[in-house]
Structures are given as C-alpha cells and as structure tokens.
C-alpha cells in the first residue's frame, strides 16, 4: 500500500525525521530518556476500530464488515445481534450484588461500546438510571480516585489559567452543543469532592443522550479544578486533582470568566452551558452573572424547580384547587429550595395575575437556624431575603409545621431523617392528603423514606422523593412513590434549546417544561398515587418537553432556527440520537 511505503520512507530514510515505529526513537526501540511520537491512523479499522467506542459493535460486526474492515480473526466467529448483546450484558450485570460494581461495569461499557451503552439505557431506563446517576453516581464520585481508569471529559485546573481556550481545542469533537460543568464543591448531598466530581457531568450528559436524544459526540463534560477544602482528599495519595485549598474571590471569578469567554469564543453563541453542583454562594452568582450573556442553565436551581413544579401541578388533580390555594413549607433554603420556591411563586403569579411578591407570602422556608423571618434580615444571605416574612422566630421544623399549617412539605436540606414521625403525623393531622416531597439525594440523605411517609400518615400522604424508593405495601394497598428526578426535565429542556437554536434561557421556558411534564401524567397514574409519569416513557416525555420549551423560545423571540417547524413534537423526535447500530460499508 502507498501509505505503508510512505511510512517506510519516513522512518527508514536518512532525512533525520524521527518518531516512526522502526526509528531509533520509536516507542519499541527508544530508551526511557528518549522522546517518542505517538503515531496513530485517522481511519479506524481492525484493532483500532474495536477500540473506538463510537463505532465498535463488538460481536455484532457482520461477516461482510469483518472482511471490509480487517476484523477477521480479531473476533470470535459468532455474530450476535444488538438485542442479544443487550441480553448478555444485563445477565452479567444482574449478577453483581454491589451497586458500585454495576456502575463501574456500565462506565466500562460506555468506554468500549457507546451505542450498546445507550441502547441499554434507553430500553431499560428504570433499572439502569439509578446506576449511572443518583444514587449510585454519588458513591462513584466519592471513590473516583481509586476506580479511575480512563479520563472522561475535560479537566481544567488553575494551572491552566491563561490557556483555557487551548484546552478546549484539545477536545477531539468540534461540534459541541451542550457542556455540563462542575467545580465539585457541592456534589449531590456529599459535599466537596473536588476533581472527583467529574462523575456528575459525565453521568448528566449520559442522560442528555439517552433520555433527551442529544448526540453523545455533541456533549462535553468539564470539571473546573480550583482545589478542594476536603482534607480527606488532600491527604489521599490516590486523589486525582490539585492538592490545594479552594480558590475563592477574585482568583475564582477570573478563572470562571476566562472559561466562559473561551467557551463562547470556541463554540459560539448557542452552546448550552449547564452549571452543576456548585456551592450555593457561587451557583446563584454565576447564574445571575451569565444568564444575560450566555445560554446557561443551573440544574440544581432551575431544573429541580421545574420538575418539582410539574409534580405540584399534576398533584392538583388529587389535592384539588389551584396552586394559589395551597401553602408551602420548605426545609432547606439553599439553591434548590429557593429556586423551587421562586418558580412556584412565578407560576402562581402568571395564573392569578397577582404580583410575585404577593405569591411569595404563601411560601415559607426553614434553614439551619429555623424559620426564615423578617427579624433575621440582618444576618440572612441575599437570596433568602425575598422569603423573610413577618412571623415570630421558630427554631424547629415541627414547630414551623404546627404554626404555618402547610398543605405541602418540601425537603431540600441535604440531610437525612429530618421528616420525623412527629412531623409527618402533624402534616397528616392538618391535611386529608398531605403532599410530602423528600428531595435530597442520595437515598441516604432523603428527609424520610417512602415507607415512613406512608406508614406515619396512615396511607394518606402523597409522596415523591429525589432518589428512587420501591413500592410500599400498607394495609393491603400498594403505594408507588414518585421520583421528582431532574432527569425528567433537563434532557428534554436541553434538546428544546438546541433544536430551536435558543440564545438565552427564560424563566417562562421552565414553566413550559413543567406544564409539559405534568400533562404526561394520566388518570391511570393518579389511581396509583403517582404525580410523575413512568420513566419508561421518558423519550416521549422529553419530546413533549422539548417542544414546549422550543415553542416558548419562538414566542419570546429567543430562537434562531427559522422557520419554526410546524410540528415541534415530531421535529424533536426526529432530532433524537438513535443508539441502534449502523451498517458499515
């Protein structure tokens, strides 16, 4: 072949060019102190094709494909269908007893055979979602240093300040549509995991592709490593990040500013940047700072708010009345709690035509120091001030429940076992059907379990949680707990922004997403006490959410893809990534 002759001339000739396989500086011949060139071929075939996760089909390569791409002899003779590969992998996966082992097996598959990974996720989402995302991903992040095998995503550290654009250009895929970025300071309910928080952007983008149909090659997970204040990690010899305390203040702000500018310069105006698991003090500031200049979305603030609002809208079929007829009490006044509260107030304002400020008075927050009230204004963080209402100080949740008498209790505290028997019983005494949402992740940090909610309320509670719980048998009835999982919202929300070429995120798009999700809950679901539709229908749900978001973007003049498609649901479905194997020439 001409290519091999050229390579021979280059490596064996006397023109001084080095780095070829046969050259003294080639990897097989060079001594440890000599430099080598990592040669590779651009066209994947043979051995390299089997190690290319985007194109590898494993034993599903046909006889014709094996001959055409030099795979003959590199694989056992059997040819399997993708369906049989799914069955084989699931059989092996189900033999593992430890969820972390299953998580690692799924991550290995993603690095080996991308299409099979996503086909499995799409076809078995209810079984596999808890493995690739909450709650198992939390343990995966905690142990990321010791289970780290191949790098996934882009790691940008303080050492790279001044070169971030160069790092973005190192990423092999050029047509990026969505970035999920974290600085690892508040990973789920687990705190500061530093660089090991990369498991979250990787997991989130897996769901963008599996549930929302965004092409995997258009997704970029990024960790901004600004250090960690977790002493355990700093002392861990296997920790993969910068071993220094977190950068703060001006140093941090300049670093993030360079990153955001580089992203826009490299990928353009319509690149979606999702902020993920930033600490409260940074999350609000970053969203506020960049929402007018970039297409940005914070899932912890906006995604959580949208999915919870959807559950509340759907629950009205069970509770009766309108949102404005209810009273809400939050345990937790951080980014999730205040984000949900603000979207609820906005929705009530839109429906009643009353000012948002008036609607906020129906919503009460409890933080670590007690009920958020006006007498505490001097010491409250800025984002809590809109929720500081006139009331005498109250320090405990049970006293707040008895004083406020809420119809809806929402937990976003990040601390487990906060909804005690006394609290749940009080909610059941106040309401015929108390709505209890224990949203903190992972499962160990949930404010109460499904069994506790149903048992302590004597079967009267309508319950949903952030992490999954099994159905509960109580006095001859089977209660199916709902899961207020952000995965209902953000994949379809992102697809909607991408498919219409949105240039900014508007709060009305979040309301549209909530209403689209709530519309997918049917009478059959309500009979079971569900306020969210089953996850098995997630691609259909995502298409409707995407259509709702895109329609609102067109209405607000924030969409750049023109003309507007006639049927946005069908258009969303046509845009979705298909993980079924393609035939090769």
Curated annotation (Swiss-Prot):
Names of required cofactors: Mg(2+); Mn(2+)
Cell location: Cytoplasm
Alphabetized SUPFAM superfamilies for the sequence: Aminoacid dehydrogenase-like, N-terminal domain (SSF53223), NAD(P)-binding Rossmann-fold domains (SSF51735)
Residues reported in the UniProt entry to bind NAD(+): 186, 300, 441
CDD domains: NAD_bind_1_malic_enz (cd05312)
Binding site for NADP(+): 329-345
Pfam families given in the database record: malic (PF00390), Malic_M (PF03949)
Top EC class of this enzyme: oxidoreductase
Site (Important for activity) residue list: 300
Cellular-component GO terms for this entry: chloroplast
Known EC number: 1.1.1.40
Key words of the record: Cytoplasm, Metal-binding, NADP, Oxidoreductase, Stress response
Entry keyword annotation includes Cytoplasm: yes
PROSITE patterns assigned: MALIC_ENZYMES (PS00331)
SMART domains referenced in this protein's UniProt entry, alphabetically: malic (SM01274), Malic_M (SM00919)
Binding site for a divalent metal cation: 276-277, 300
Tissue-wise expression: Leaves.
Subunit organization: Homotetramer.
Function description: Plays a role in CAM (crassulacean acid metabolism) photosynthesis.
Protein name: NADP-dependent malic enzyme
Organism: Mesembryanthemum crystallinum
